[in-house]
Amino acid sequence: KCCMRPICTCPCCIG
């Protein structure tokens, strides 16, 4: 999952 990466640009991380 991209949310697990150091730099996250996914909607699930941004809110």
UniProtKB/Swiss-Prot annotation:
**UniProt source species:** Conus regius
Tagged with keyword DNA damage: no
Gene Ontology CC: one annotated term: extracellular region
Modification type 4-hydroxyproline: residues: P11
Q: Give the UniProt keywords, A-Z.
A: Disulfide bond, Hydroxylation, Secreted, Toxin
> Keyword Secreted on this protein?
yes
Disulfide bonding pattern of the chain: C2-C12, C3-C10, C8-C13
Can you tell me which family this protein belongs to?
A: Belongs to the conotoxin M superfamily.
Q: In which tissues has expression of this protein been reported?
A: Expressed by the venom duct.
* Annotated GO MF terms: toxin activity
Q: What's the record's remark on domains?
A: The cysteine framework is III (CC-C-C-CC).
Question: What start-end ranges are recorded for coiled-coil regions in this protein?
Answer: none
What is the protein name given in its UniProt record?
Conotoxin Reg12d
Task: List localization entries.
Answer: Secreted
Q: Give the superkingdom in one word.
A: Eukaryota
